Amino acid sequence: MSSAHLPPVVYEDDWIIAFNKPSGLLVAPDRWDPKIENLMQLVHEHLSPDYFNVHRLDKETSGLVLCAKTKPVLDSLSGLFQAARVTKTYVALTRGVPAEPSGVIIKRIAPDPRKPGLMKVWSGGKRCETEYEVRELFRRHALLDVHPRTGRTHQIRVHLAAIGCPVISDAFYGDGCGLFLSQLKRRYKQKKSEPERPLIGRL
């Protein structure tokens, strides 16, 4: 495997390095199957075995992943994350429009015992808070800026699904269907000789 498989580096200095992780790549080894390729495996193979990931993103989520180059830097940055002194912003395209243009979703979530690796809203779970703002509306879809105030596994996806706005193409908490131009553009006409392809589809 060549270093070309490493995601693009968007920032680096003597203490940290930030990668633009693509959708479909784990950040760290999977608990169920540690052999699945992940970002830290690539970083350790091609850059340094001493780097640490400061946080994680879901496999299906693309975005910036920050890595510390030393243990003291990791401890310092981890403290900032734990103290909620780091602002995290996600952009989500949903199927369904929130009832309000902005708000805070407060729902307790916990692991789903019937579906290993997945989460669910449950009154006995841990309290989670997700703030959102509608950036733009597309008929029955919405583009949201999302700010998780807490950091539970799959929190954003579970919370958005809970208010009837699952993330497009989310097969775990939504219908898994892609987004088609015909769903957004009025009077859209598709060539009869060609099937319509999704603008955004499943991995």
Predicted regions and their residues:
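Active-site lining segments that contact anionic ligands and/or coordinate catalytic metals
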Residues: 141, 153, 200-203
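Phosphate/ribose-recognition catalytic cores of enzymes acting on nucleotide-derived substrates
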Residues: 161-203
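Conserved active-site beta-strand-loop modules that form the wall/rim of enzyme catalytic pockets
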Residues: 142-144, 154, 165
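Short beta-strand segments enriched for Tyr within beta-sheet-rich domains
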Residues: 152-160
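Short alpha-helix boundary/capping motifs
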Residues: 33, 150-151
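Polynucleotide-recognition surfaces of large bacterial nucleic-acid defense/processing enzymes
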Residues: 147
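RNA pseudouridine synthases
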Residues: 1-139, 143, 160-161, 180
